[in-house]
């Protein structure tokens, strides 16, 4: 029972499962193809050696100890009867005959294997010799061609050198001939100056002509030899280039032969076993991935280089457009300042003309001059305090529609008030015009600070208030007393004398320039007024022209600004394109990596399935 229990599990196991080489056989499924071939070849050699050893032992009538087998297991014997003779004693001859036959069979097998190996080796040797002979013939042919090309190039170089030496000598002869011509010419000129006889002059002239002929021939030979030398030099250069090409062909052939016959493992060693379909497909896809990745990298580099160059160009154009825009804006500002200065100069000239006209009219022209002076001073004060020039806002339409009526009304009211106070009519008109101009200038300065739209309203309110107050003042007793006080004050303070001196000065000025009659004064005043009007019109025209020029420059600046914005958009677009190229590159690599991962997973699954099938097959 104990023996049955001990051998219970092993009793039901077959011989394959308990064989000692079972683990070694299981390891065959994990070997590489080359290792598998090596293992099988070694096992075959060991088997043949073992069989030869057993055959020789049996031929020598020396049976193996304990009937040893190939796997070192005891030999199994068929059951025999107790009285039966031993099987070995009766079959000695048959054993010897079987061993001899096995030895003969092994010898034939080894001879066949050796013969096939020798035939294959001989065949490969013949192929090798033929290929070597072809390569040797090709190298010999290329070497001969290179030698011929070298010899021809050397001969051409020697010929070119000789031709160059001949051309150099011919050039020297030509220079010597030119020197002889110069000497003959000098002798002839000296003879002419000395007044030598005609026969002497004729001989010298003939010698000069002969020297010129020889010099021409020498120059012709020198030119011909120089052309021949140039031609031979070109031929030598062409042959040298051809020789270098032959040398390059020889070098390429030698390198190719060295690479082909120095590492021709396919002709000397058996080919490695082919891969399976899935493995080969995986290898092909791996190469494909490498090629695509390399192509993607090169494409990305080329796009990046292109976009970088385009961005650099657009940035340069943008900088140029920006500089042009700044120049146009600066030019427009300078033009505007220039036209403003011109307008101010013309305005001062008009003011001076108005003052000149005041000497002849004593009324409206002086008032205009005072208004111009007040406006000029007010313009400077306003520009210094607020930075705004109301002279640019209040031009001719304001003068015609507001200033003149306002000034005339204020002057009329003041003149009437002064006449009512007992002042002389002429002096009252002069003072009224001056005071009206001053009041109008003050009102306009205030209007410039308040706003141009309120000029008429402020002026009308000032006029109404002044008229009402003056009327009330003249009707009241205080007004009458004020008139008397003004008369006395004027007498005491010398205002009447001041007015008389002013009138006298104006009269002297009119006489000094030849204006005696009132009509002459009016004529000159009209002329000054016309001149002022013409200058005013010219000022307006120049200001308008300056405004047009400034507008044109600003339009050019706006065009440049549009180009700058367009260039900025192009740079942004190039950046977006470069980003898209990088994203596409990353997406391609991701797809390829995913594909290779799927192929690797499929190959791993196939390998796992094969291993599982082999395990199940061994377990049978």
UniProtKB/Swiss-Prot annotation:
Family: Belongs to the SctE/SipB/YopB family.
Region annotated Disordered, chain positions: 58-95
Cellular location(s): Secreted; Host membrane
Primary subcellular site in the record, as a coarse category: secreted
Coiled-coil stretches noted in the UniProt entry, renumbered to this chain: 309-339
Segments of skewed composition (Basic and acidic residues): 66-84
Gene Ontology biological process terms in this record: symbiont-mediated disruption of host phagosome
Organism of origin: Burkholderia pseudomallei (strain 1710b)
Name assigned to this protein: Translocator protein BipB
Segments passing through the bilayer: 355-375, 401-421, 430-450
Function: Plays a role in the bacterium-induced formation of multinucleated giant cell (MNGC), which is formed after host cell fusion, as well as in the intercellular spreading of bacteria and in the induction of apoptosis in macrophages. May act in concert with other effector proteins to induce fusion of host cell membranes.
GO CC term, one of those recorded: host cell membrane
Pfam families, per database record: SseC (PF04888), T3SSipB (PF16535)
InterPro entries: BipB-like_C, IpaB/BipB/SctE_N, T3SS_SctE/BipB
Keywords attached to this entry: Coiled coil, Host membrane, Membrane, Secreted, Transmembrane, Transmembrane helix, Virulence
């Amino acid at each position: 029972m104990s023996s049955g229990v001990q051998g219970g599990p092993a009793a039901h196991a077959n011989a394959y499962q308990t064989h000692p080489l079972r683990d070694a056989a299981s390891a065959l499924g994990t070997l590489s193809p080359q290792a598998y071939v090596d293992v099988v070849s070694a096992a075959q050699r060991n088997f043949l050696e073992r069989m030869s050893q057993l055959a020789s032992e049996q031929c020598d009538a020396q049976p193996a100890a304990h009937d040893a087998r190939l796997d070192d297991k005891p030999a199994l014997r068929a059951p025999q009867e107790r009285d039966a003779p031993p099987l070995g004693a009766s079959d000695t001859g048959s054993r010897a005959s079987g061993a001899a036959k096995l030895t003969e069979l092994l010898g034939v097998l080894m001879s066949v294997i050796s013969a096939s190996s020798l035939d294959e080796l001989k065949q490969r040797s013949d192929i090798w010799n033929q290929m070597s002979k072809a390569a040797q013939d090709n190298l010999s042919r290329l070497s001969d061609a290179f030698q011929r090309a070298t010899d021809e190039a050397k001969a051409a170089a020697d010929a070119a050198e000789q031709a160059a030496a001949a051309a150099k000598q011919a050039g020297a002869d030509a220079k010597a001939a030119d020197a002889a011509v110069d000497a003959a010419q000098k002798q002839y000129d000296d003879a002419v100056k000395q007044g030598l006889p005609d026969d002497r002059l004729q001989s010298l002239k003939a010698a000069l002509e002969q020297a010129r002929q020889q010099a021409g021939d020498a120059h012709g030979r020198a030119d011909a030899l120089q052309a021949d030398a140039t031609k031979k030099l070109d031929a030598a250069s062409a042959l040298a280039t051809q020789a270098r090409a032959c040398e390059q062909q020889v070098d390429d052939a030698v390198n190719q032969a060295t690479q082909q016959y120095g590492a021709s493992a396919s002709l000397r060693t058996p080919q490695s076993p082919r891969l399976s379909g899935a493995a080969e497909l995986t290898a092909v896809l791996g190469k494909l991935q490498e090629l695509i990745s390399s192509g993607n990298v090169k494409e990305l580099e080329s796009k990046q280089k292109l976009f970088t160059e385009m961005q650099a160009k657009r940035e340069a154009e943008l900088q140029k457009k920006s500089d042009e825009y700044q120049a146009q804006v600066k030019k427009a500002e300078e033009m505007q300042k220039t036209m403003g200065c011109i307008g101010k100069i013309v305005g001062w000239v008009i003011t001076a003309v108005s003052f000149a006209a005041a000497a002849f009219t004593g009324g409206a022209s002086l008032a205009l001059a005072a208004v111009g002076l007040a406006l000029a001073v007010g313009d400077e004060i306003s520009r210094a305090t607020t930075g705004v020039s109301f002279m640019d806002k209040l031009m001719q339409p304001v003068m015609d529609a507001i200033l003149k009526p306002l000034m005339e009304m204020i002057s009329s009211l003041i003149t009437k008030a002064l006449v009512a106070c007992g002042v002389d009519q002429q002096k009252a008109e002069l003072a009224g015009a001056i005071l009206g101009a001053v009041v109008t200038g003050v009102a306009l300065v205030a209007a410039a600070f308040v706003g141009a739209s309120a000029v008429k309203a402020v002026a009308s309110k000032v006029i109404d208030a002044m008229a009402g107050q003056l009327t009330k003042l003249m009707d009241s007793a205080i007004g009458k007393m004020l008139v008397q006080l003004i008369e006395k004050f004027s007498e005491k303070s010398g205002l009447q004398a001041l007015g008389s001196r002013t009138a006298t000065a104006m009269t002297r000025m009119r006489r000094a320039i030849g204006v005696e009659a009132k009509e002459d004064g009016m004529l000159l005043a009209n002329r000054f007024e016309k001149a002022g009007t013409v200058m005013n019109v010219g000022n307006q025209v120049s200001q308008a022209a300056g405004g047009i020029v400034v507008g044109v420059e600003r339009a050019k600046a706006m065009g440049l600004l549009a180009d700058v914005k367009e260039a900025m958009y192009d740079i942004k677009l190039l950046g977006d394109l470069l980003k898209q190229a990088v994203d596409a590159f990353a997406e391609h690599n991701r797809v390829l990596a995913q594909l290779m991962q799927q192929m690797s997973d499929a190959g791993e699954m196939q390998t796992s399935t094969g291993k599982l099938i082999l395990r199940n097959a061994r377990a049978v």
